[in-house]
Amino acid sequence: MNYLNNIRIENPLTICYTNDVVKNFTANGLLSIGASPAMSEAPEEAEEFYKVAQALLINIGTLTAQNEQDIIAIAQTANEAGLPIVFDPVAVGASTYRKQFCKLLLKSAKVSVIKGNASEILALIDDTATMKGTDSDANLDAVTIAKKAYAIYKTAIVITGKEDVIVQGDKAIVLANGSPLLARVTGAGCLLGGIIAGFLFRETEPDIEALIEAVSVFNIAAEVAAENENCGGPGTFSPLLLDTLYHLNETTYQQRIRIQEVE
């Protein structure tokens, strides 16, 4: 847990341009791992913030015509500042509007990580793909989708689902931790995007080990929280997840991580 230990020591400033539904949960999750979240959205202050920040999360969950240009502007400012971007194209396949905006953003700025479920990442590489809301699609071949997305966008791809897939360069990793309760809490996936950003430490081409650790820390914490005797369902799971992120230690991490490199 080298990256998490560094987060707990250095408290990296993590800027989150995220959706209105999840801001509080995302901020609290980042605080739980030791990061310092800032939910800054104004392009007018981006240049100053990005000089001292370690990463930027862009999450389009509540995309509107009013914030389109702000998102493009902050992404370009992040590029100019050498700040890595984690892009979460929430529900990109649900509407033509979302898909067109995501394509525009990815043409207008360079992102370091694209994170989404299989349906969302498929929508970025296949114009005919559709999806149901923000749900993951267990029937899709996530490894193949991730590899195709990497080939197109030349950026790290993280696909979440029952198993999580990470593709960076010539490596493809499958991670098998997590809990079904994550799908019962709104904003859990959005928090993961923020946590990935917290692990980047200003690396615009992040090491795959940072991504593996970020995803595994989150999912192992979810497992432990779900197994807690005080967890009665989604309502008690959420605060227990934050507590477990705060207390997670090396022993638990190493005992539980389930990882496989695939062709």
From Swiss-Prot:
It comes from Staphylococcus aureus (strain MRSA252). Keywords: ATP-binding, Kinase, Magnesium, Metal-binding, Nucleotide-binding, Thiamine biosynthesis, Transferase. GO terms for biological process: thiamine biosynthetic process; thiamine diphosphate biosynthetic process. ATP binds at residues 115, 160. GO terms for molecular function: ATP binding; hydroxyethylthiazole kinase activity; magnesium ion binding. Substrate binds at residues 39, 187. Its EC number is 2.7.1.50. CDD domains: THZ_kinase (cd01170). Belongs to the Thz kinase family. Catalyzes the phosphorylation of the hydroxyl group of 4-methyl-5-beta-hydroxyethylthiazole (THZ). Pathway: Cofactor biosynthesis; thiamine diphosphate biosynthesis; 4-methyl-5-(2-phosphoethyl)-thiazole from 5-(2-hydroxyethyl)-4-methylthiazole: step 1/1. Gene3D superfamilies: 3.40.1190.20. It comes from the Bacteria. Its cofactor is Mg(2+). It catalyses: 5-(2-hydroxyethyl)-4-methylthiazole + ATP = 4-methyl-5-(2-phosphooxyethyl)-thiazole + ADP + H(+). This is Hydroxyethylthiazole kinase. Pfam families: HK.
